[in-house]
Amino acid sequence: MERPNLPILLFLLKHIILSKMKYNPKKHHRRSIRLKGYDYSRPGWYFITINCKNRARLFGEVKDKKMILNEAGHMLELQWLALKDRYWNVALHQYQVMPDHFHSILEITAVAAVASTAASPQKRITLGDIIGAFKSIVTVEYVHGVQQFGWLRFEGKLLQRNFYDRILRGEKSRQRVAKYINDNPKNWRDT
């Protein structure tokens, strides 16, 4: 009896497995947590929360109800504050770095668009674009800190894939969220 050709056998096995795992839009899609139909490039106030992957405590610690930033926490803070220099239409308000997450109130003051060519129309810059750029820069800087300064290592990704936002409508809503952000270190539960 002849031995089967191993590369052909592996190819056929892989083909059979992959054919059984076809794309199913009911199973294989990312659900957006953004408000459906809302234009996130338009002016508005947003409450933002960004979490570390697996809630890893990488940015400092809370002591005596005060947040003590480590070097990584200071880096995150500096990158957040730099957003207003990168985006002319962004105003930053209340924010708080926590050991495993970050809260802020961000205001988009006007519609902005990236440069376009005749072949591609202007793309408006959205809240997701701004937060995505911030998360990318923070990750690159954090990796540099791990390599150069021995910051705590992380597995896989530094930050969770998404971010949470709430559209703030009205001054009372903004004041309530600003108080929540301010009080975050006081209400921290070290579990």
At which residue positions do the language-model features occur?
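Short catalytic/metal-binding and nucleic-acid-binding patches
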Residues: M1-T191
